[in-house]
Amino acid sequence: MGTRLPKPANGAVFKRLPEGGVLFSTEDEVYFGVGIVGARIWELLPPATSTVEEMVDILSAQYRDVSAAQIREDVDRFLKELQTNGLVSAVATDPAGT
């Protein structure tokens, strides 16, 4: 089992644009612009994928000129930014550690 992905927050609205996308927090009433890769990461959040590893595999197949390690680092950083801005929910931890 891999690292579970956070889910989009209930108050997060996403609009795809040719150059990436825009996220809107209905709670904070703030817009966030994201690039093409950020938009793709957003689109791969649950229910599209359930783990970070699954997301990295998909992105690695799309961006073959970037190492999986670099993609993982970028995904982790972007997910932290989304969480900091309240655009994704925190991942619930399983007390059994699974």
What role is predicted for each listed range?
Residues E27-T98:
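Long, charge-rich, low-complexity alpha-helical segments
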Residues M1-E29:
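Long, low-complexity, charged/polar intrinsically disordered regions in eukaryotic proteins
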